[in-house]
Amino acid sequence: MTQTTAIFMATALVVLATLIPTYIISKRSAVSEDDWAVADRSLPIYVVIGTQFASAMGGGILVGHLGNAYLNGVAILIYGFLTALPFFFVMIPAKWLRQNNFTTVPEILRHFSNNSKFVGILAAVMTIFVPFGWITSQITAFGSIYSTITGVNYNLLCIVFTFVSLLFVMPAGLKTVAWTDFIFACFMIVMCIVSVIYVTNMGGGLQNILSTVDPDMISMSGSIKKLGAGTVLLWVFSVMPGGVTNQLYFQRVCAIKSTVYKGLHRVGI
């Protein structure tokens, strides 16, 4: 068995091990419109935490910004902070959103505009536009990684992964997406811990790494200088507005089973 075959077989097993349980969960009852939009408002808080985490920490961070941190240092933590901060803002109206049974950002804005169709259409277009880069980054990140380690054509991998992604949506919309996100979030956390331990050992221990790395890489001011203050400023004016208006975040808040939000701050943490 070649390395490429082994990688694809392992990937297929992980996908199936995630899809099958979530498919069974989604098929316990008939699929409704609410299942597709807000998972029938039945998601436990721990699933919401997992799916929000997986939505925020997708391919852009796991691949792009991980490489960015390798090149420019600890300043990349600012991006992670800006990604998490919107959750605390979303938490403020969370109970009101859930009690009013909203499902989408356009629906919320139409509520404040006397049910204006123009506002609804404009909001719908922007709701698609804002997370478009995040969504495509998942596909391109997969293509970049697997093309490098397998030698398979990058464009072909992106197309295949697009269709695989549809398999997570087709059974019951957000209900299956949320549960698969939760499973993947657990997997991401475990692999993060394993990777930190493994890489630290490869580097000869934390003290050895700190003594050999460029001091600017582990200094916030030096790292910002390497990265560019303009880049950090652009993050502030793109990630923050994008986060507090992100349909993905609001949709999952509206899908929480309970209207009690004492634990919702855990999403941001």
What are these regions (language model features)?
Residues 1-62, 169-172, 185, 191:
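Membrane-interface "cap" regions at the ends of multi-pass membrane proteins
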Residues 37-103, 237, 249-269:
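Membrane-interface helix-loop-helix modules in multi-pass membrane proteins
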Residues 18, 78-170, 235-239:
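Helix-loop-helix module between adjacent transmembrane segments
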Residues 17, 125-135, 187-199, 232-244, ...:
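Selective recognition of specific alpha-helical transmembrane segments in multi-pass small-molecule
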